[in-house]
Swiss-Prot record:
Keyword Methyltransferase in annotation: no
GO CC annotation, single: cytoplasm
Pfam families, alphabetized: PTS-HPr
Protein name per the record: Phosphocarrier protein HPr
UniProt xrefs under NCBIfam families: PTS_HPr_family (TIGR01003)
List of residues that carry Phosphoserine: S46
Subcellular location, record wording: Cytoplasm
Activity control mechanisms: Phosphorylation on Ser-46 inhibits the phosphoryl transfer from enzyme I to HPr.
UniProt entry tagged with the keyword Cytoplasm: yes
Record key words, sorted: Cytoplasm, Phosphoprotein, Phosphotransferase system, Sugar transport, Transcription, Transcription regulation, Transport
PROSITE patterns, sorted: PTS_HPR_DOM, PTS_HPR_HIS, PTS_HPR_SER
InterPro entries per UniProt: HPr, HPr-like, HPr-like_sf, PTS_HPr_His_P_site, PTS_HPr_Ser_P_site
Length: 89
């Protein structure tokens, strides 16, 4: 299992556009990828799961990946979050 934690810095939080980009990126990997925030967790490959979590600015999130390509998935998702300005690099 691989994971990383970060604070959401986007002024509107984890909203529809970046959630869609993250779900698309996560879907490229065979690992199970979970986002955890505010004692809730969701499947990062599902935009609806991510949106239902209503993650706001300043929220600490953890992304976990479990599977054969977990390390690669975590690296790609972290970079995607930086590129979409959800978190700071």
């Amino acid at each position: 299992m691989a994971k990383f934690s970060a604070i959401i810095t986007d002024k509107v939080g984890l909203h529809a556009r970046p959630a869609s980009v993250l779900a698309k990126e996560a879907s490229k990997f065979s690992s199970n990828i979970t986002i955890i925030a505010n004692e809730k967790q969701g499947n990062l490959k599902s935009i609806m799961n991510v949106m239902a979590m209503a993650i706001k600015t300043g929220t600490e999130i953890t992304i976990q990946a479990d599977g054969n390509d977990a390390d690669q998935a975590i690296q790609a998702i972290k970079q995607t979050m930086i590129d979409t300005a959800l978190i700071q690099g």
